[in-house]
Amino acid sequence: MTGRKNPPLEFAPVPEGAPITFDLLAQAYLEDYVLQRYKALTTARARIEHLRQTFGGRLALTINANDVRSYQLHRRKEGAEAATINRETSILSRMFQIALRRGQLDRMPLFPTRLQENPPRQGFFEHDEFLKVRANLPQAYADVLDFAYYSGWRRNEILHLTWDDVDLIGGVVRLSPHRSKTRAGRVLPISTPLRAVLKRRQRLRKRTDNHVFHRDGVTVRKWRNALRDACQAADVPHRLLHDCRRTAARNLVRAGVPERVAMLLTGHKTRAVFDRYNIVNEQELLTAGERLADYVSKSRS
């Protein structure tokens, strides 16, 4: 499938006895990133570039806690969110840790306290909102939205899905571990709505491309713009594609699916998502309320 690709990483050998600078720390970090096959390399490189604007060319041992605090203040003034700044300084800390393990440094700065982050987003799609928004999306985007809404999968897991992963006869979609953010494969039963999506995609399948979701053979991109415009046209508050993931987890619980099974379907490794977004089975709350009223009534009689 065509689309933007990351330029290849080029790792220059480090001369023996060369001074350890921020730039060498960054190179070692990216080498480790590639070796570990971590996801979101583009994001990691972008964060490093923010760090490079402040620390580029500096000797590693001259970077101290005050410098890191100044960086936090600088990024705040630029309008960066606390969560973004924390991710960037975590990368810087990781750079030093790698250098320590390699014997390139014998110490690292004591990093300042992480910034207090805003509570996580709690956006959800109500079903009528979902229908209105998808009606204002081009078909390729609507199909991805459908799959996200009924699966709870992550965006990249959906966009990188291939027909090798789809078993329409067996009625399952299999996500291979190397394409999962958590590196754990999983199986998704093909429900009626998902089958309709996959049938549509099958009719649009390109012989030269094995990806399920594309737009005339090109990667489906610019999601934020597409959803923003569709939400505006539908008179629905702005939503993100990731809101489908939260919505799917909530809908599974509301449907009476045990949390353990819901986690297997969506790929959540811990139940923290249910606490974070206050996802509860409302029927259980209603039942608990009735039991409380019944108990009080009996205790007074």
Question: What function would you assign to each model-found segment?
Answer:
Residues 170, 179, 191-237:
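Active-site/catalytic core of tyrosine-dependent DNA strand-transfer enzymes
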Residues 85-88, 101, 105-155, 159-161, ...:
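Basic, Lys/Arg- and aromatic-enriched nucleic-acid-binding interface segment
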Residues 165-172, 238, 257-276, 301:
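Short, polar N-cap/turn motifs at the start of nucleic acid-interacting alpha helices
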Residues 50, 58-73, 77-112, 154-156, ...:
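N-terminal DNA-binding recognition helix of tyrosine site-specific recombinases/integrases
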Residues 18-48:
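Short, aromatic/basic-rich helix-turn unit that serves as a nucleic-acid recognition element
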Residues 14, 170, 181, 200-207, ...:
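C-terminal secondary-structure termini that scaffold catalytic or DNA-interacting sites
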Residues 124, 175-183, 195, 259, ...:
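Catalytic-site neighborhood detector that most strongly recognizes the C-terminal catalytic loop/helix
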Residues 84, 143-146, 150-157, 226-229, ...:
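C-terminal catalytic core of tyrosine-transesterase DNA break-rejoin enzymes
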